[in-house]
């Protein structure tokens, strides 16, 4: 604190003792206090006074008598009071004959408040009081102006008071003049910023005179503010430190006021101003305060701000530790709500919006004090730049403050909703009481904070708090998204059981990625696909139908009810037998082919035409396209003329095979179970032509509608295995209408001439064998009697099962066997008895020719009248 003595020298005190010594040295008659009141033994007082740096420009007269009292508190807040007494030359030093000028300093960080109270001590007497010259400047850092109380006289006791003249000079060149009329405002020049032009301070001057036996003394309240005037709200933040509210006036910190604006508010009490001067009516305080009250300040005015009261009472209403005042924090909370839209505009997607809003409260106030003409955009720009240069450690205080404000906002919203619940349905007081109980635990935590006091009144008297929150509802509605997490936390505390279940359900799809699920589904489809087909033919057909569906865009997924009904029907043997009997062979052929190209439209039309045909007509119709396909696909077997030559070649082949010894002759036919058809146990190569496969499949497809097939069907349809066994010569597949395929082992001697003739015989056998299914199944005699002549040995015989037995073996999907189960001859001693097994045994091509043209054809014709016409054609061709 710099003080100029009578000689004009300035001194600075660094500590409490130095401050005392300086005052003693430069002020002759100084009464120091016996003790300094404070809560710490440090030199906070001296440091705070030194930060104020009051430097008077002039000190007209020395201070004969000075009484000082100081009060220290934490957070750099203090109140310092000078009691200055000036005695004239003829008056005594008694309190009753002196006029005291009391200077009160209230300091908080960069905000200082000086209150000057001039009052006579006791009863006034004759005489005039010389000038009192305390020079005081409440300015952070630099000296801007001087407040000087010039000499004034007190009139003799009488009916009226003497004139009062006080002159306060703001800068050296532009003094502030207070006229005698209390309604005249103070005027100052525009260059009131002083030499430095930096800094801002508020000086509150309260001048109170008590003369004579006047009951209600006159009180004057002057507010002198230097160039950057910004009225501060009670408890506003100044540089990050909470400062106490002003003693007299309060306003918002953001609204800039014109430079060098000085507002003078007066309030006259009983009595007159001066003798001979009219006493004008005192203007109401509301008419003088609006220019300095911000619209954003919703806080009430402190009591005693512009009314009667001594300095002690004024200071008692604004204690130094005003940071704990709920009213000041509540106003900061409202300012924070007003600043949040500004912060969101600059940081739309940042989570620092609430903290930045808290940061704007002190920064915008400081900027407005330094430069009141600064626009809001410029202030926000400077604040944002300051925020970017602020470290994370310094930001923590604003984050904590924002967290508390969010809690207050959430609590306020809850109070509003509760008031609505209480006001709306009057018949729900019992449900409302349990809702208040869960709020009990968070209440003590927030009660520790001083700001919770306004919201604390909500639960006690919700009906009385209904009107105040009403105007705040629009503000809180816009702020609903931030406090929602706090509300969720409360609900989690209320309902612990259901909350853990919901996250568990939502975490299930997050833990298992969809790619893994799809991969699992694909693997299961690959694993379960063959197993489903192995259970039976109906399931295999349905599975293949489902596989074809994604390939055909026109098809739609089947109905689950329809599928269950189909499964039920497929479980019935009679239904399966009937379905297999009427399945179109072309459809099965195309379905089982490697590259199917089905014409569903033509197939559907053809099936519609076949609905009106009888069984015999249907058989004939199916034989015609089979012949055409036979000629188109098999070049050696084109036309019926080839069948005539095939009989002679076939007979020659029979003679050639008879000459071959039994061990080396063609192989006996042995039955191959369905499980072993897919593999070649002998290690022989699997070679077959697509032509033979197509011809064999067509032949076996046509066998399904024969009466023998419909008479008896197998219980378990064969699998859709598609292996091939080596054939004779060219290894073409030979299909017989028997239930199981047979393999023909290579037992022919190497280098024999018969091996070269077998390829042509195999083609002939393939072409002639396709005619067998239409009359061979109807033979009533056993196959051994049909195909084995007496001169053949036991290994040169062919065995064919009876009609009933063959019907059972032909029932399972002939098409599947036509495509993938070729039959080959192998020698087997089964001539004497018919084979009861699933397949038929063929010892060679001789048996096939013998069965085609042998004496058993007459018996077969007798057994099957439906195919007699076809048999005649075959006999003619042979």
UniProtKB/Swiss-Prot annotation:
Pfam families in the cross-refs: NUT
Basic residues bias (residue ranges): 476-487
Bias-annotated ranges (Basic and acidic residues): 537-551
UniProt xrefs under InterPro entries: NUT, NUT_N
Region Disordered, annotated ranges: 273-324, 417-566, 627-757, 775-878
Domain of life: Eukaryota
Biased composition (Pro residues): 278-288, 427-444
PANTHER family: NUT FAMILY MEMBER 1, NUT FAMILY MEMBER 2A-RELATED
Family as reported in the entry's similarity comment: Belongs to the NUT family.
Protein's UniProt name: NUT family member 2A
């Amino acid at each position: 604190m710099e003080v100029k003595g009578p000689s004009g020298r300035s001194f600075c005190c660094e500590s409490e003792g130095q401050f005392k010594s300086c005052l003693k040295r430069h002020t002759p008659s100084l009464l120091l206090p016996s003790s300094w009141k404070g809560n710490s033994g440090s030199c906070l007082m001296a440091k705070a006074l030194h930060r104020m740096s009051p430097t008077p420009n002039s000190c007209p007269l020395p201070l004969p008598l000075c009484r000082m009292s100081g009060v220290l508190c934490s957070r750099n807040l203090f109140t310092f009071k000078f009691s200055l007494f000036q005695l004239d030359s003829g008056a005594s030093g008694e309190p009753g004959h002196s006029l005291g000028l009391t200077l009160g300093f209230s300091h908080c960080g960069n905000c200082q408040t000086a209150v000057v109270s001039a009052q006579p001590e006791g009863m006034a007497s004759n005489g005039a009081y010389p000038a009192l010259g305390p020079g005081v400047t409440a300015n952070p850092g630099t000296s801007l102006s001087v407040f000087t109380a010039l000499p004034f006289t007190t009139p003799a006791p009488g009916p009226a008071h003497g004139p009062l003249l006080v002159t306060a000079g703001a800068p050296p060149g532009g003094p502030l003049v207070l006229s005698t009329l209390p309604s005249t405002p103070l005027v100052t020049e525009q260059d009131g910023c002083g030499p430095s032009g930096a800094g801002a301070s508020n000086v509150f001057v309260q001048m109170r005179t008590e003369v004579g036996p006047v009951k209600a003394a006159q009180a004057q309240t002057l507010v002198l503010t230097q160039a950057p005037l910004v009225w501060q709200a009670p408890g506003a933040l100044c540089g990050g430190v909470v400062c106490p509210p002003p003693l007299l006036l309060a306003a918002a910190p953001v609204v800039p006021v014109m430079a060098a604006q000085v507002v003078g508010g007066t309030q006259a009490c009983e009595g007159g101003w001066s003798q001979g001067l009219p006493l004008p009516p005192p203007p109401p305080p509301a008419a003088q305060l609006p220019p300095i009250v911000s619209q954003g300040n919703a806080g009430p005015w402190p009591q005693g701000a512009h009314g009667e009261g001594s300095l002690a009472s004024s200071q008692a209403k604004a204690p130094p530790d005003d940071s704990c005042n709920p009213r000041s924090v509540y106003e900061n909370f409202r300012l924070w709500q007003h600043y949040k839209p500004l912060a969101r505009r600059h940081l739309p997607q940042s989570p620092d919006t609430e903290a930045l809003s808290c940061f704007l409260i002190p920064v915008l106030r400081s900027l407005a004090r330094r430069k009141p003409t600064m626009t809001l955009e410029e202030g926000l720009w400077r604040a944002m730049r300051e925020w970017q240069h602020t470290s994370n450690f310094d930001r923590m205080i604003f984050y904590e403050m924002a967290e508390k404000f969010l809690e207050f906002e959430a609590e306020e919203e809850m109070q509003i909703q509760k008031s609505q619940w209480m006001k709306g349905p009057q018949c729900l007081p019992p449900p409302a009481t349990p809702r208040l109980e869960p709020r009990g635990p968070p209440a003590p935590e927030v009660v520790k904070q001083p700001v919770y006091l306004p919201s604390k009144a909500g639960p006690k008297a919700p009906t009385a708090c209904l009107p105040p929150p009403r105007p705040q509802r629009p503000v809180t509605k816009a702020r609903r998204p931030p406090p929602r997490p706090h509300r969720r936390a409360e609900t989690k505390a209320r309902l612990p059981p259901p909350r853990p279940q919901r996250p568990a359900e939502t975490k299930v799809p997050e833990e298992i990625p969809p790619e893994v699920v799809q991969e699992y589904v694909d693997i299961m489809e690959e694993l379960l696909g063959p197993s489903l087909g192995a259970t039976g033919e109906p399931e295999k057909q349905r599975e293949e139908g489902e596989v074809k569906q994604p390939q055909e865009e026109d098809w739609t997924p089947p109905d689950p009810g329809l599928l269950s009904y189909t499964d039920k029907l497929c479980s019935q043997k009679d239904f399966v037998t009937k379905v297999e009997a009427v399945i179109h062979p072309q459809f099965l052929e195309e379905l089982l082919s490697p590259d199917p190209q089905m014409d569903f439209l033509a197939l559907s039309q053809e099936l519609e035409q076949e609905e009106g045909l009888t069984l015999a007509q249907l058989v004939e119709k199916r034989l015609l396209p089979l012949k055409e396909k036979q000629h188109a696909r098999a070049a050696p077997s084109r036309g019926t003329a080839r069948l005539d030559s095939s009989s002679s070649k076939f007979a020659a082949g029979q003679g050639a095979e008879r000459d071959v010894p039994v061990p080396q002759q063609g192989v006996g036919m042995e039955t191959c179970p369905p499980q072993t058809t897919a593999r070649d146990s002998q290690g022989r190569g699997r070679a077959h032509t697509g032509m033979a496969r197509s011809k064999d499949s067509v032949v076996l497809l046509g066998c399904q509608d024969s009466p023998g097939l419909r008479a008896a069907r197998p219980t378990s349809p064969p699998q859709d295995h598609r292996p091939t066994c080596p054939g004779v010569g060219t290894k073409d597949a030979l299909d017989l209408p028997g239930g199981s395929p047979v393999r023909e082992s290579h037992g022919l001697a190497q280098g024999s001439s018969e091996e070269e003739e077998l390829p042509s015989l195999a083609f002939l056998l393939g072409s002639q064998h396709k005619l067998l299914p239409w009359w061979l199944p109807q033979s009533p005699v056993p196959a051994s009697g049909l195909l084995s002549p007496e001169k053949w040995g036991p290994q040169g015989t062919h065995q064919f099962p009876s009609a009933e037995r063959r019907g059972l073996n032909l029932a399972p999907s002939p098409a599947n066997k036509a495509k993938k189960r070729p039959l080959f001859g192998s020698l087997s001693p089964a001539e004497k008895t018919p084979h009861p097994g699933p397949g038929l045994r063929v010892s060679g091509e001789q048996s096939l020719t013998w069965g085609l043209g042998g004496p058993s054809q007459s018996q077969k014709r007798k057994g099957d009248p439906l195919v007699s016409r076809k048999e005649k054609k075959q006999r003619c061709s042979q």
